Amino acid sequence: ATHFYNAMPVVYKEHEFKVPGTVESVYALQDMTVETIADGIHVPPVMLHVVYQIKGVEKMALITDSLAYAACNGEVTCEPRVILEDGVCKLADHSALAGSIATMDTLIRTSILKAEIPMIDVFRMASETPAKIMGVFDRKGSIEEGKDADIIMFDKDINLTYVMQMGHEKTNCL
C-alpha cells in the first residue's frame, strides 16, 4: 500500500454498521507492505510509530514522494494549483496536501527523533525493505560483497555527511 494513510479512508459507518476502511484492511493483511511518507506532515510521528508497531521493519518502507521542489524553502508556486508552504506542497485552495518536498535524510531524522523508532530499523526501512519490495535486493538495500556500493553516512545529529553511489563519491548531494 503506497502513500499509506494519505487519502485513505479509515473505519466508517454504513447505516448502523461500522465498515473497515483501507487503513484497517491493510493492517489486517499481514503480508501487505506499506510505503509511508515519514516526513511528520503527511503522517504524524505518533502514527508512524503505530505503523511500525503493527507492520514492523520487514513490512514498512520509507518513501519521500518528493516533487521537483524537494528541499526547497519558502513559499513558491509549484504548479498553477499547487503551492509550497510550511515545508509541504499543498493545493492552492489549502484543501489537501499535494506532495512532499522532504528528502530521505529528513524522513530518517523524523522517524528516529520524533517517531522514536530504533535507528537500525529506520535504516532498514529506508534501504533493505524498499529494495525487497522492488525486487532489487540482490544488488541494492544492504552492504554486501557483489552488491552496488550505494552508501550514505551521517554525523551524530543524523545530518548527511557522505554519499557514495555505485562506488563513486557524490559531492553535489550534500
Region spans (language model):
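Catalytic metal-binding/acid-base residues of hydrolase active sites
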Residues: 5, 40, 67-68
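Histidine/acidic-residue-rich, glycine-tolerant segments that coordinate divalent metal ions
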Residues: 2-20, 71, 167
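Non-cysteine beta-strand/loop elements that form the S-adenosyl-L-methionine
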Residues: 1-6, 60-64
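Glycine-rich anion/phosphate-binding loop at the beta-strand->alpha-helix junction
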Residues: 39-45
